[in-house]
């Protein structure tokens, strides 16, 4: 089992990734069985390599799925919570720029009818 490179995994299709994932899980299961039966001590160090390879494959696969979901919901007004940008609580609850610039009817009428006062200093 050689070390997997993520940039190589990104070039593979979803079907190839899932097949590779199944193979890695099978290999991991055999290593775990050999660990319990204590037949191959040389294989114990490979367990970590296989576990990390499984994690890499799953990471690439899940990132791809999430990116596809983002593209799907890009045009819609409401997106799922897990696809929204991760912000602090204060930034999520903050008013939007449109909400900040909104004025009441009274404020709008006052701004229209009463021009801003200009003060001139006499020198």
Swiss-Prot record:
InterPro entries (UniProt xref): Ribosomal_uL29, Ribosomal_uL29_euk, Ribosomal_uL29_sf
Key words, A-Z: Ribonucleoprotein, Ribosomal protein
SUPFAM superfamilies: Ribosomal protein L29 (L29p)
S-S pairs: none
GO cellular component, one term: cytosolic large ribosomal subunit
GO molecular function, one term: mRNA binding
Gene3D superfamilies attached to this UniProt entry: 1.10.287.310, 6.10.250.3450
BP terms from Gene Ontology: maturation of LSU-rRNA from tricistronic rRNA transcript (SSU-rRNA, 5.8S rRNA, LSU-rRNA); translation
Similarity comment: family membership: Belongs to the universal ribosomal protein uL29 family.
HAMAP family: Ribosomal_uL29
Name under which the protein is recorded: Large ribosomal subunit protein uL29
